[in-house]
């Protein structure tokens, strides 16, 4: 499987000279399956550039899958600007979490009402299907994709995608169930040592994954003022991923206030923490344009 990051920012797009390296577009990742199928992970503002590239490279009609973790703005605002949706003959299957009083289709239609956007959902020329997903194991785009609830203020799913003996987890957005990760801080390191059952379940979901993409919007110092907003610290993410014996960890959903220099320091501190835990896990702050093979 191949991945390309088209948007790594959380909350709101933040273009400017201070975000040139890590990027200012909100959440969007392109996954290409071993069979050459395209799966779009979230449709934040990064989806616009991805859509333009898909059209430029298309030799025929575009058929793709869109997996939405949830429907907060930073994960769907690129949907109306995703140009392949406007092309007759293209086909898309769009999946997102059940649990709202509105269907996934109705939520996406809501942001495209004429109050907010000149083109309504029903005017899109591509063939589009919508499905509300529950927790569990699903067969999507020829792959086994598991979905699990994240700890976030709206209905949100994390995904584990399996192909060719490899697993990729995409986990955004998620807040720790307990600020203290370990039962005994003097003995960290294993899933069984994690204090809260919710955090243990979260770690189990990514156990043994070759590659995990996890939101890490805050530092531990910032978190107390952001409690219950539905986001993690890099320290929490490194600890649960190390306990789950993840091989490669990519931190994303960067806070809009974090410029390139700040995120380089986050990356340094996250790697240092992994080393302190005795984990060989590779830790990277994801940036726009980053391409990864899993």
Sequence positions of predicted segments:
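Binuclear metal-dependent hydrolase catalytic cores
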Residues: 1-183, 260-294
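Cap/insert and terminal regions of metallo-dependent hydrolase folds
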Residues: 178-281
């Amino acid at each position: 499987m191949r991945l390309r990051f088209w948007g790594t920012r959380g909350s709101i797009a933040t273009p400017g000279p201070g975000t040139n390296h890590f990027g200012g577009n909100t959440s969007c990742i392109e996954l290409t399956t071993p069979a050459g199928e395209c799966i779009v992970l979230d449709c934040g503002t990064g989806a616009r550039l991805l859509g333009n590239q898909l059209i430029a490279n298309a030799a025929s009609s575009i058929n793709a899958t869109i997996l939405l973790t949830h429907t907060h703005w930073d994960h769907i605002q690129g949907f109306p600007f995703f140009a392949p949706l406007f092309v007759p003959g293209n086909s898309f299957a769009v999946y997102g979490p059940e649990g709202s009083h509105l269907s996934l289709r109705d939520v996406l239609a809501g942001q495209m009402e004429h109050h907010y956007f000149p083109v309504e959902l029903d005017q899109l020329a591509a063939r589009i299907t919508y499905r509300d997903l529950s927790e569990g194991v699903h067969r999507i785009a020829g792959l086994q994709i598991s979905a699990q609830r994240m700890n976030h203020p709206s209905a949100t799913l994390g995904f584990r995608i399996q192909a060719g003996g490899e697993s990729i987890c995409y986990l955004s957005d998620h807040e720790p169930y307990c600020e203290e990760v370990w039962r005994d801080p003097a003995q960290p390191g294993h899933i069984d040592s994690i204090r809260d059952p919710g955090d243990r379940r979260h770690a189990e979901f990514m156990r043994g994954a070759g590659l995990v993409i996890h939101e890490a919007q805050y530092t531990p110092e910032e978190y107390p003022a952001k409690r219950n907003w539905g986001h993690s610290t890099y320290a929490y993410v490194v600890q649960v991923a190390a306990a789950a014996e993840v091989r490669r960890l990519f931190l994303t959903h960067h806070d809009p206030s974090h410029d390139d220099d700040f995120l380089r320091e986050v990356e340094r501190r996250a790697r240092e923490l992994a080393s302190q835990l005795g984990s060989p896990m590779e830790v990277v702050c994801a940036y726009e344009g980053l391409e990864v093979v899993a």
